[in-house]
């Protein structure tokens, strides 16, 4: 049987290793966790250059940063360009630089394969993706039916991948951002702490695009959305659904922790959690550790930023929007300023606190957004805006 490709999207601290390693316990599946974000950074840069040239935007600064696409008409237009693209784009950057960055990054997530990253090659991005998957295949002792990887921040590239690989399928893993942001803000290495606003916007982007993909011409029936919480609380049911989606027989090894193997450390998977609770199973206690420990002002700030998306996912909110906008307005603005003025290694905002605060509050206070370009600026797409207006939920498992 011909091997097909599988691609996943999630955000950091969302259980990407857990679900990819669990699925890889099934001999029909092999997935790697976050093997090469540089592949997407270089792809984003090249798409930006093409977009700049087509739109004749001389002053547009192109870079490798993974965008959230909120708050700017140009960013919204760039997202539409990426959503209409494919991987048949020539690789024009310095291949040695790309290999070196890929190698350095791989030592953090797939160090068992990192030496192979020094030789990754391809004339187009499609060929680079294929070569990346060939490297991942080296982990498998047989010919799996499904082969691929999951990466963070990159959900906007799913349509391009779908056009280039017509038989590929896609997984989207969602986790409550209050849990992931709490975990990120409390990591030991302070250099890994992200800006809360930027992380929240990437979560919003993930939800808006995931919902639209369920109706997409290129992705309909090729995409499966599940939550980290469902994986932890109902592992057998959740993994069975994924196996059904992939048309492979469920293997109970995927839900037996003793069989979940950490490929890069060459040992049984132990997980990584700021709770410091030892991991020996699909642990419910660790999942909600954040609820007893998160700072109340940070909780309000996150719920303010992700209010509509949390509701759309069915997550229970501790605060209602009206209270956040009135009684807690001052505290939220203080959290905003503290977050935006703090030095971090990664952020995707404009760097202008007043502009960002004004934008986020107007996103909530505008009674109705009518212009398509404004809907995209505030909510990414019309599909999610309709969900917000009608108080509906997206389909997750």
Question: How would you name each of these model-derived features?
Answer:
Residues 34-149:
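PAPS-dependent sulfation machinery
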Residues 1-6, 248-397:
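PAPS-dependent sulfotransferases, especially Golgi type II membrane carbohydrate sulfotransferases
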Residues 17-29:
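A conserved segment at the C-terminal end of the G1
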Residues 7, 100-254, 264-279:
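PAPS-dependent sulfotransferase catalytic domain
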């Amino acid at each position: 049987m011909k091997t097909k490709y599988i691609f996943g999207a999630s955000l950091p601290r969302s259980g990407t290793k857990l679900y990819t390693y669990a699925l890889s316990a099934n001999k029909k599946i092999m997935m790697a966790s976050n093997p090469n974000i540089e592949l997407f950074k270089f792809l984003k840069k090249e798409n930006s250059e093409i977009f700049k040239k087509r739109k004749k935007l001389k002053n547009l600064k192109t870079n490798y940063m993974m965008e959230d696409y909120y708050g700017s008409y140009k960013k919204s237009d760039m997202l539409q360009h990426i959503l209409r693209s494919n991987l048949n784009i020539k690789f024009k950057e310095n291949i040695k630089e790309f290999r070196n960055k890929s190698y350095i990054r791989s030592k953090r997530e797939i160090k068992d394969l990192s030496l192979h990253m020094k030789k990754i090659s391809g004339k187009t991005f499609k060929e680079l993706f294929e070569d990346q998957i060939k490297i991942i295949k080296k982990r498998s002792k047989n010919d799996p039916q499904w082969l691929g990887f999951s990466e963070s921040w990159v959900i906007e590239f799913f349509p391009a991948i779908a056009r280039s690989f017509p038989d590929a399928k896609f997984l989207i893993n969602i986790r409550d951002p209050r849990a992931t942001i709490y975990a990120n803000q409390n990591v030991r290495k302070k250099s890994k702490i992200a800006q809360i606003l930027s992380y929240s916007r990437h979560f919003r982007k993930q939800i808006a695009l995931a919902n639209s993909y369920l109706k997409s011409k290129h992705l309909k029936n090729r995409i499966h959305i599940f939550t980290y919480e469902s994986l932890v609380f109902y592992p057998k049911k959740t993994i069975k659904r994924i196996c059904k989606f992939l048309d492979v027989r469920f293997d109970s090894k995927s839900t037996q922790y003793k069989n979940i193997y950490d490929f890069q450390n060459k040992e049984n998977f132990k997980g990584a959690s700021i709770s410091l609770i030892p991991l020996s199973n699909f642990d419910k206690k660790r999942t909600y550790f954040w609820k007893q420990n998160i700072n109340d002002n940070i909780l309000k700030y996150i719920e303010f930023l992700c209010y509509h998306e949390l509701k759309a996912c069915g997550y229970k909110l501790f605060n209602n929007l009206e209270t956040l906008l009135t009684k807690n307005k001052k505290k939220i603005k203080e959290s905003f300023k503290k977050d935006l003025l703090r030095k971090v290694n990664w952020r995707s905002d404009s760097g202008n606190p007043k502009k960002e605060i004004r934008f986020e509050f107007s996103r909530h206070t505008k009674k109705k957004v009518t212009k398509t370009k404004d809907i995209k600026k505030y909510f990414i797409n019309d599909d999610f805006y309709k969900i917000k207006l009608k108080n509906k939920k997206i389909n997750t498992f």
